[in-house]
Amino acid sequence: LLIDLVLVVIDGSTRDLGTATQLINELIIPSLGEKSNERILVAINQADVAMKGGNAWDRKLNSPTPESARFLNEKIASLKQRVFEATALAIEPIYYVAGYHDGKQQQRPYNLSKLLFLIVGHTPKNKRVILADSTLSTKTSTWLDDDRRSNYNQRTRDSLWEGIVDSIHNGAELGANIGLAFGSAGGAVG
């Protein structure tokens, strides 16, 4: 495959889902071909400012207020429905906050652990080793706040290890096959 994974990041502060939906439906999904639902992730960034007003984000808990969560879930439902109606493809968008620090104010990330888990899970096992070797933030606050629907940090580690073990197994198998060219002793060494 030429493209393993497409991550579509939608600006949560915009009301215009039509442009993103059109891009997903008319360009991205047709380009992905088979099993495109396994190779596309849709994430709405800036969830903290998606809904306007003072009741949009609980700064103390660093999570959406109940009103904001309803608003974001409606946005996700609309996006899912529009993509499904146009392509018959079921996607599972998420919302998150990347976080920022501008010198005066700081917004901690939210749901980044979930986004990373989904990226790793949608990446072919044999390519997860590359992600495991990548430099990810070591600040625990980056991965702390999420929707608590799962232990995304542990599940990400498990997925990465699954990819590493799978790659080691495949490498050993390949080595044995190459070694067989030199007889049974070569196969054992390979």
Regions found by a protein language model. Give the residues of each.
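Conserved GTPase G-domain substructure that encodes guanine base recognition and part of the catalytic core
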Residues: L1-D166
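Membrane-inserting effector segments that mediate pore formation, membrane fusion
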Residues: R155-G190
